[in-house]
Design a protein with these regions (language model features):
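AAA+ P-loop ATPase mechanoenzymes
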Residues: 1-49, 57-58, 65, 69, ...
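Conserved catalytic network of the ASCE P-loop NTPase/AAA+ motor domain
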Residues: 44-47, 71-73, 95-101, 121-129, ...
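Hydrophobic anchor at the beta1->P-loop junction of P-loop NTPases
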Residues: 54
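Conserved nucleotide-binding/hydrolysis micro-motifs of P-loop NTPases
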Residues: 84-86, 111-112, 138-141, 160-166, ...
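Walker B beta-strand of ABC/ABC-like P-loop ATPase nucleotide-binding domains
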Residues: 105-106
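Conserved catalytic/switch belt of AAA+ P-loop NTPases
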Residues: 109-149, 154
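Conserved AAA+ ATPase small/helical "lid" subdomain
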Residues: 160-167, 173-193
Length: 193
């Protein structure tokens, strides 16, 4: 275990992944985060676990959105970075999940697992987390067994926020002070912010 950004991170484990159990701070609201939360919260409140795929091109804020949703739920969150992973949850990952019993699990860059993704999900079914969130840059490149109906409860595409959100956050005076070019740049910022 090592400390990183005030969290304990399980590193140098046989799976080769950074497994980070932590409690996330409250997240700012955004229209898309509010929409997704409105879809999953009634189930979580009723005690029914939910599984969510967040899909979108790189840089749209899927990872931030995943943290936002997990923070809204509260409780213990397990962040797993799958960047370049091949052996996630074969042995040590499942042991960590069973030991920590997180309320939410976030699997970042899930599409990087390739053919190992189905095995990973099968292992996660044994973990009784209330919320499973996976992020992917290319849903269509994933094994059809992953995206078949019934495997995940919800699929959301993450995109940019748009001008209305930033007018609310920045205030109309500040927004109007931006040049048209800068307004266009800000409008393209990820939806998770």
């Amino acid at each position: 275990w090592a400390h990183y950004n005030d969290c304990a991170v399980f590193t140098n484990n046989p799976s080769g992944n950074a497994i980070n159990p932590c409690t996330l701070p409250a997240a700012p609201s955004s229209p898309q985060a509010d929409h997704i939360w409105a879809r999953i919260d009634p189930f979580l409140t009723a005690g029914q676990p939910r599984s969510v795929i967040l899909d979108g091109r790189p840089g749209t804020g899927k990872s931030t959105m995943a943290r936002n949703l997990a923070a809204r739920m509260g409780g213990r969150v397990l962040l797993v970075s799958l960047d370049g992973a091949e052996n996630v949850f074969k042995v040590s990952g499942l042991e960590v999940l069973n030991f920590l019993r997180p309320d939410a699990v976030i699997l970042d860059d899930f599409d990087r697992l390739g053919g190992h993704a189905v095995n990973c999900l099968d292992g996660l079914e044994k973990c009784r987390s209330r919320l499973l969130i996976v992020t992917t840059n290319n849903l269509h490149s994933m094994d059809p067994a992953i995206v078949r109906p019934g495997r995940f409860d919800e699929l959301f595409t993450i995109d940019s926020l748009g001008a209305a959100y930033f007018r609310d956050v920045l205030g109309s005076g500040c927004w109007e002070a931006l040049s048209a070019e800068n307004q266009a740049k800000v409008e393209a910022w990820p939806a998770a912010f």
